[in-house]
Amino acid sequence: MNDTHVSVQQASKAFKEVGALRCVDASFERGKIHGIIGRNGSGKTVLLKCICGFMRLSSGRILIDGQPVKPAAPQNIGVIIETPGFIGSLSGYQNLSYLASLKGVIGKEDIERVLQCVGLDPAMKKAVRKYSLGMRQRLGIAQAIMERPPLLVFDEPMNGLDNRGVEDMRALFHSLREEGKTILLASHNPLDIDGLCDTVCEMDAGVLRRV
């Protein structure tokens, strides 16, 4: 039985009469990895921002677990949509610890666990300003998964990663799927999603179609 986690219904978004999303309809099943492929400027990021409630649709609606997404309302979603921003003078561990303290939901062992999951445990005490782009991306993924949200939304998650890093993240995403997480993964590079995703859609000029 299909268990829809995210439903996009006739979603449109325009900026000064330019259509970024054009009547998008899509259903994303729970516990699957869903790839969205498309060139830069095709509308992928706009769609993900609307799903997360960061941006308001011009028309249509988006449902998560059957409930309409409300812009600016708290969502139980792990997100990487733009280059993660961290405090450069603090270590990777300290950055996650600070973010966790704002919500008071996870402890020391949980932070160490997610850093290990993304392969940053050897560098957890290193200042983030000394991190490479790939290491910052790993830290962003650690931040996204540390509260164990059921839905993960990743825009270009392989950005800055070397071949080893890409393979590590692919393995991590598979393990997250085994835990029942739903993952929406957007990329301009078909190689990022090849063999990784359960479903693949292509976004072109604001139009989404199943591949």
Which stretches of residues belong to each language-model region?
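Conserved ABC ATPase "signature" region
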Residues: 97, 106-123
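Conserved ABC transporter NBD signature motif
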Residues: 60-73
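Helix-to-loop junction immediately C-terminal to a conserved catalytic motif
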Residues: 52
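The feature captures the beta-strand-to-loop junction immediately N-terminal to the Walker
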Residues: 37-39
